[in-house]
Amino acid sequence: MRTDLFMNQEDQLNQEILNYFERMKFSGVAHYFCCWSYGWARIFHQMDRWTGITTTTVSPIIQMILRCYLLIFTKDEILIKRVKLFGKESLPAHSDNKHLVRLSRKDIQSLQVKPIKSRFIGEGGYEIMIQADKKYYFEIHNLTDNSFSAVQFKQMLRQGYFE
């Protein structure tokens, strides 16, 4: 069961995202959700997932490298924005264009969503790969809760958005 504190933080993040859309004057925002990326440490994460060893010294190091991203899907482009996890604001106004990648739909060569097979009991989540000039990998988990990210992502899956 989620606590009120977590729900308030989530509501605050969702409001910050909506304010960000307004500041950036995005039009036609269809879907958005927050997800995780391992960046250059992805290979260690993959080895950890394949072996099922989550108690090694590598896992805590990878978790420190883990970054949260906001994926925004408009009719013309996909935007990838890094979200701060610590501090007063997750999307401060002074850094609207910082850590923002804009990918035109015509430049995207591939968009794949694959279920993550978990070796343990519980939901594994999904891996998202976007290939344009380079490949971007993300993961989304905890799809059983009613967070805005879980709701948006499940809606996109139901609509066949990634097919």
Positions of PLM-derived features:
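Structural alpha-beta junctions
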Residues: R23-S27, L103-K106, Y161-E163
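Intrinsically disordered, low-complexity segments enriched in small/polar residues
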Residues: F26, S37, W50, L85, ...
